[in-house]
């Protein structure tokens, strides 16, 4: 699986992917978040990456250099050159087959290649599948945090050389 930087023509497919995942009801995603403005901003900033296979957009991930959580006293231990991994999303039709682990590894490899030394992320507290994905991949649970009107679990992981 190779993540490539998204381009403006990817925006409709990314938004459709987000909506398909939102319908699963395992997170706070809905018709208002993530929205077209967020997708356009991520593409403009060069922080949105996608995975396509046979022309179909199957996954997306955003790697931010900074996010609000970096300024919050959440108890991160790995604070040297972190990125914030957000909006990690795999097509519902591809879930449950180990591809989520591959997507997470691809996002970590990309972050490492971009010079980041740690990953910080928020996981909706209701999303037990994502919680298992992150803990299974070696992410350290930091805390629970009520942010943006929702309850999140905060995770982090240092990025080591492969």
Model-identified regions with their sequence ranges:
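Short alpha-helical
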Residues: 9, 13, 34, 57, ...
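Conserved acetyl-CoA-binding loop of GNAT-fold acetyltransferases
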Residues: 135-144
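Acetyl-CoA-dependent GNAT
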Residues: 8, 21-28, 32-87, 91-93, ...
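A short beta-loop-alpha structural element at the N-terminal edge
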Residues: 2-16
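Conserved acetyl-CoA-binding loop-helix of GNAT-fold acetyltransferases
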Residues: 90, 96-109, 132-136
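Conserved beta-strand-loop-alpha-helix junction that forms the acyl-donor binding cleft
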Residues: 95, 121-131, 147-151
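Conserved GNAT acetyl-CoA-binding A-motif
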Residues: 104, 111-123
């Amino acid at each position: 699986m190779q993540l490539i930087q998204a381009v403006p023509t990817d925006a409709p497919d990314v938004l459709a992917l987000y909506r398909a995942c939102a319908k699963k009801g395992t997170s706070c995603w809905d018709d208002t978040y993530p929205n077209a403005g967020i997708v356009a901003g991520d593409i403009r900033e060069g922080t949105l990456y996608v995975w396509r296979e046979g022309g179909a957009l199957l996954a997306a991930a955003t790697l931010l250099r900074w996010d609000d959580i970096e300024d919050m006293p959440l108890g991160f231990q790995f604070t040297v050159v972190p990125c914030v991994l957000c909006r990690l999303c795999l097509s519902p039709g591809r879930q449950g087959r180990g591809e989520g682990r591959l997507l997470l590894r691809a996002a970590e490899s990309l972050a490492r290649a971009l010079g980041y030394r740690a990953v910080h992320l928020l996981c909706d507290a209701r999303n037990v599948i994502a919680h298992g994905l992150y803990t299974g991949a070696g992410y350290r649970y930091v805390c629970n945090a009520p942010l943006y009107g929702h309850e999140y679990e905060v995770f982090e992981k240092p990025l080591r050389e492969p």
